[in-house]
Amino acid sequence: EMGIFGLMIPEEYGGLGESLLTYALCVEEIARGWMSVSGIVNTHFIVAYMLKQHGTEEQKAYFLPKMAAGETRGAFSMSEPHCGSDVAAIKSKAVRDGDDYVLDGQKMWLTNGGSSTVVAVLVKTDEGSDSVYRNMTTFLVEKPAGFGEVRPGLTIPGKIDKMGYKGVD
């Protein structure tokens, strides 16, 4: 009702169009009240911001109004079992198949995994530079909310029993 899911989404896409400073202050205040809720909205904000900054006009028109309304929730997956926080060491890849890409690999965590309907997945491609710090692309993968095999080849494990952040799936 407050429109918080659209905090940084431009008004033309149904959002509030607020600044990064306002975003930081909002997340700080939400975390002060309940850390898990800040994790839920912050991950959504990150995906919305990536789309706003780097998405095509078609992607923005398709995703941002639904994200601003809270109808579509964003999730982000980057870490992999073998590399921890060393993002350059990821091995998941996207291989071009005609006009499409096929994503292959395993991720360690998927914040908002069960509740999200669009996932930003960081993978390597074979296009461009030979540097391990380049050729990384974020793909948007639509999925139904829920756990288990939600799409062929995409399994969202159940909630992890964590010490903190218990409200974040």
Question: Where are the predicted features?
Answer:
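Flexible, small-/acidic-enriched active-site or ligand-binding loops
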Residues: F147-D169
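Active-site-adjacent elements of ketosynthase-type condensing enzymes
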Residues: H82-I90
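A short core secondary-structure module
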Residues: D100, D104-G153
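Internal helix-loop-helix
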Residues: M2-E71, N112-V118
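Short beta-turn/strand-loop junction motif enriched in small, turn-promoting residues
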Residues: E12-G14, S79-C83, Q106-W109, K124-G128, ...
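A structural signal for short hydrophobic beta-strand segments in well-ordered beta-sheet cores
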Residues: S92-V95
